Design a protein with these regions (language model features):
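Surface-exposed beta-loop-beta
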Residues: 110-181, 188-192
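Outer-membrane beta-barrel pore domains and translocons
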Residues: 43-45, 108-110, 155-161, 185, ...
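Non-catalytic alpha-helical scaffold/packing segments enriched in small hydrophobic residues
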Residues: 153, 177-184, 202, 218-223
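Short loop/turn motifs that connect adjacent beta-strands in outer-membrane beta-barrel proteins
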Residues: 32-35, 100, 140-151, 187-199, ...
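Outer membrane beta-barrel
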Residues: 1-110, 213-222, 226-238
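Active-site-proximal binding-pocket segments
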Residues: 174-176, 189-219, 229-233
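Extended hydrophobic secondary-structure segments that form protein cores and membrane-embedded regions
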Residues: 1, 39-41, 152-158, 198-207, ...
């Protein structure tokens, strides 16, 4: 990032010189005919569940959420106003009261280091636990080629860690922020339910306290088209 003057990670795939990290290791249990689910263990809050085929928690997005198959820039993978901790010990609860609605909540170690098991930072030293709550609505708009899936998410987060104020007046604890993440398929090439060719759009917005966060607000918009070139049905342009 320093070489190109970018505030965000220019390549979210690059993780340094380490050869391997254990990203997640957890116990998972479903309840109520799979309408409720809980995970306990080492968890990654940026990649948890799906609902109606859409990312269900947290700050998910169907068209801008995967640095391996979509955009490389970190700000188009997750909202940079959200201070997600490294994968570490935590609890995630995901509930789907209806087919078109979900609620997700999590508490995780704010001091986590992905290179460790998580026990050192979670149970020794400051009791800093990052919390996040999200709800999403998943409408399907009618079209001649079948339903057009959308996802409209809103969430808030809480970070108890002390942060230095930029004006030098001390530190602040109990930081809070809000975010939105939206994606919508607007055009399908054919009626096959298993065929994802077509155009999808996305948008994100987030806000955080400017006195302790470098990014006080953020927005992004974009889209992707799969199968734009005839006979190249799996190619994606973003």
């Amino acid at each position: 990032e320093s070489s190109v003057g970018s505030l965000f990670g220019a390549n979210a795939v690059a993780v340094g010189d380490r050869s391997i990290d254990v990203w997640q290791l957890y116990f998972e249990q479903s309840f109520a005919n799979d309408k409720a689910n809980i995970r306990i263990g080492k968890v990654d809050l940026t990649g948890c569940y799906e609902c109606r085929g859409c990312p269900g928690s947290f700050d998910g997005n169907s068209f801008a959420n995967d640095e391996a198959t979509q955009f490389l820039n970190g700000s188009l993978v997750n909202n940079p106003t959200i201070p997600f901790p490294d994968p570490g010990l935590g609890i995630v609860v995901h509930v789907e009261p209806a087919e078109w609605w979900y609620v997700s909540a999590a508490v995780a170690d704010a001091d986590a280091d992905v290179r460790e098991t998580g026990f050192r930072t979670a149970f020794h030293g400051p009791d800093n636990f990052f919390s996040i709550l999200e709800t999403g609505f998943l409408p399907q708009l009618p079209s001649t080629n079948g339903p057009l899936q959308g996802a409209y998410r809103i969430g808030m987060w809480y970070d108890p860690q002390p942060k230095d104020r930029f004006n030098g007046s001390g530190t602040k604890r109990d930081d809070v922020g809000f975010y939105l993440s939206v994606d919508q398929v607007v055009c399908k090439e054919n009626a096959d339910a298993d065929d994802s060719q077509g155009l999808g759009l996305f948008a994100r917005y987030g806000v955080a306290d400017s006195s302790v966060n470098e990014v006080k607000s953020f927005w992004s918009v974009g889209g992707q088209y799969q199968g734009l070139i005839p006979t190249r049905d799996d190619d994606v342009l973003g």
